[in-house]
Amino acid sequence: MSTNFIYPPPKDGKPFRLSLGLRELDPANWIEAGSDLVEQLKQRKELLETKRTVVFQEIVGYEEAALTYARALKDNLSKFHSDYVVAGDQITHKPTGITVNLLEDHPFVQLAQVIAEDLCLLSYENSTWNLVAGVVIFPSRWQLLEKIGKNIDAIHGPVPGYQGALQPLMVDTFNKISPERPVWRRNWSLHETEELHEPTYTPHQVEISDYWWRTERQTLTKSKSNQFLLFTIRNRSEPFKWIKEDQQATSEFVKTLESLDPQMLEYKRLAQASRGLIEFLKN
């Protein structure tokens, strides 16, 4: 596989299927930096200032849990990331000079200005997990305002096949995550532009060769009380054409694309482009 992709397209040629695919997370990798971080931080600050209600929502009453997680992330930055200086509740990202204090606004809003990860707080209530706070600056065609306060089944309702493949497993799987063993997974999509802030889908007329490979690296960390989960999302957008630097990866990903059923193609906004993408990979 080309070394360009941070998280490359699947190379196993297996048919696409919905799965959680959880893996144990090394605490040293809870937060990811990367060459795109500085540019992302500029976008994040601007969007927090101009579209706050779009990118931040909360249910009142969960501030303490959010602050506890924010402080844990702050300590993690201090321990594992030399580009940060931490003093009390203040965090400075040295390359940009951005400084925030977790107590001067909602802690997720503050933290989101110095890391690339979006942050969602889930609370276990009424035998399910509910989204009670979130900073989602780079949504992939979904709107935080529509999801806040809902449980995980309602949040994932639009995903084709979710009810049969994942709904029976989600709550139990989340319940089994232990505070001592956080987990991570990844997700992918193909987009017509490199824009990461895409709360709604807007069609663009682009050449197939100009599509973008979008990945989400997601983590789940349970609180010591077992009542809360912090869900983080690290978004990246990279030129899809990089895949052609690896002949095996190209041919195997064709099989994955060909396995997508009409409902999933429509959900991923690839119904019109799938044939062109496959031909692009084959030629």
Stretches with model-predicted labels:
Residues 1-283:
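Extended, well-ordered protein cores
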